[in-house]
């Protein structure tokens, strides 16, 4: 540990203790703290990093700026869990304390092998003044490796690749390494932006997890956004999926969507050679969802977690900024295939935490439940409506499922959020997972998902679906 690291450790611990004391003294300052969703102890959280299960324990690292609830220099915060429900904060794992990551320990992934956790990330270096997320030169995106044998103490950082090691037709935007092993060889994908402002994913290969060679690039037939970041490659059944968050989609259907999108392509062929990409499928149609990352559990499930936020969004915000923190993760989701479609559902561990409150037909009303799951099943009529906390409405009519707020003022429940929707021929079932300040909605067994933050004054709910079964369970 060098002098800079020691100073950063003290500063972070001081900021965290100050926030803890503040919330102990003020109920209003902890009002919107979540029960199921991971949040920063203080300051800002964004991308999930290094998601894995290591020696039976789940690890979730996160982009962490403890000194500013609106973002700042990035480091890796660290949580662990035995069940992905109850998490324990382990402190800051990685600090920006080396010449090759001095302006931020940016996003990356974990790879588990031989009793060790290999953490790969992008070390950010800013060489000149400017809007670093948008300029084409003037910054470094270095690929860095750290190894831990116990998930608690982290070894010496090793710089693996620099800008000069990437193809020369790229801007300075190469980042977010995700690593896996296949047929005895190690592979890495990274997001990239070309000099022509075209987004793509780079594929590297290695025989030893340290020395990497560029192998291929994956891109759409026509330009699709100017940057593809946070790439992830995995298989669900026989389907090969390339997940990536895309910046720069404009016009057409994207006008009614978020600033940036997160979704996946199905791959026909081989990303190491000849391939064909499907159309781009969104992971989530709601307001707050970006930079997802997946990992495989020891029992073979593919788990998916995202930042429950949206970068560069001027339309809406979060009032928790005023109380010293901002953002959370989505609740962990299992990705699965049903009838040829990729779907998502809350992890099965949640079932043990549910306590039945009501199970009725057609209509339900309740109050005083900030953390709950509601399901509507056996929907036979092409119309239903759910009202949460008086101003968040989920409804289906005329082939369109909508999530919309009746009050879009930035001081209201919505904090500026308006409406998101998807066209669905038929809705058969609905699952709502609500936390103190977030809602996730799973339509048709998770074929479509909507995520949003919300900030209620009262916790009320009403549901009307003629002939359908409505079940409400409190989550303890």
Would you name each region that the model predicts?
Residues 234-237, 470:
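Juxtamembrane/interface motifs at transmembrane-helix termini
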Residues 228-231, 290-292:
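Repeated scaffold domains used in trafficking and secretory/extracellular systems
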């Amino acid at each position: 540990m060098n002098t800079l690291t020691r100073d950063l450790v003290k500063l972070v611990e001081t900021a965290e203790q100050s926030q803890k004391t503040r919330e102990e003294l003020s109920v209003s300052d902890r009002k919107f703290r979540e029960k199921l969703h991971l949040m920063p102890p203080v300051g800002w959280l964004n991308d999930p990093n290094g998601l894995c299960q290591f020696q039976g324990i789940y690890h979730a690292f996160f982009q962490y700026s403890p000194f500013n609830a609106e973002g700042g220099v990035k480091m890796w915060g660290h949580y662990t869990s035995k069940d992905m429900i109850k998490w324990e904060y382990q402190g800051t794992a990685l600090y920006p304390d080396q010449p090759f990551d001095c302006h931020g320990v940016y996003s990356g992934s974990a790879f588990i092998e031989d009793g060790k956790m290999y953490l790969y990330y992008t070390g950010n270096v800013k060489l000149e003044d400017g809007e670093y997320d948008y300029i084409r030169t003037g910054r470094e995106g270095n690929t860095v490796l750290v190894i831990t044998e116990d998930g608690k103490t982290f070894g010496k950082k090793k710089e693996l690749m620099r800008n000069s090691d990437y193809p020369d037709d790229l801007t300075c935007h190469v980042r977010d390494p995700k690593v896996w092993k296949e047929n005895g060889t190690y592979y890495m994908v990274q997001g990239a932006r070309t000099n022509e402002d075209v987004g793509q994913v780079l594929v590297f290969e290695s025989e030893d997890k340290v020395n990497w060679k560029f192998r291929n690039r994956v891109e759409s037939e026509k330009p699709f956004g100017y940057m593809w970041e946070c790439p992830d490659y995995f298989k669900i059944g026989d389907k090969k999926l390339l997940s990536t968050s895309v910046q720069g989609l404009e016009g057409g259907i994207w006008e009614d969507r978020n600033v940036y999108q997160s979704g996946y392509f199905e791959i026909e062929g081989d990303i190491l050679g000849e391939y064909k990409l499907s159309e781009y499928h969104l992971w989530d149609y709601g307001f707050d969802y970006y930079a997802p990352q997946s990992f495989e559990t020891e029992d073979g499930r593919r788990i998916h977690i995202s930042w429950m936020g949206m970068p560069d969004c001027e339309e809406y915000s979060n009032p928790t900024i005023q109380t010293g923190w901002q953002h959370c993760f989505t609740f962990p989701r299992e990705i699965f295939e049903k009838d040829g479609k990729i779907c998502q559902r809350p992890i099965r561990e949640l079932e043990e935490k549910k306590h039945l409150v009501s199970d009725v037909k057609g209509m339900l009303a309740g109050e005083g439940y900030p953390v709950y799951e509601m399901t509507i099943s056996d929907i036979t009529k092409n119309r239903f409506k759910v009202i949460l906390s008086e101003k968040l409405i989920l409804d289906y009519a005329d082939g369109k499922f909508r999530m919309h707020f009746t009050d879009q003022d930035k001081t209201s429940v919505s904090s500026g959020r308006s409406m998101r929707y998807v066209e669905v021929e038929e809705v058969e079932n609905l699952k709502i997972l609500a936390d103190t300040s977030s809602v996730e909605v799973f339509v048709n067994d998770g074929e479509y998902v909507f995520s949003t933050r919300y900030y209620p004054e009262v916790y009320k709910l009403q549901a009307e679906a003629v002939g359908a079964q409505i079940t409400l369970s409190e989550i303890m």
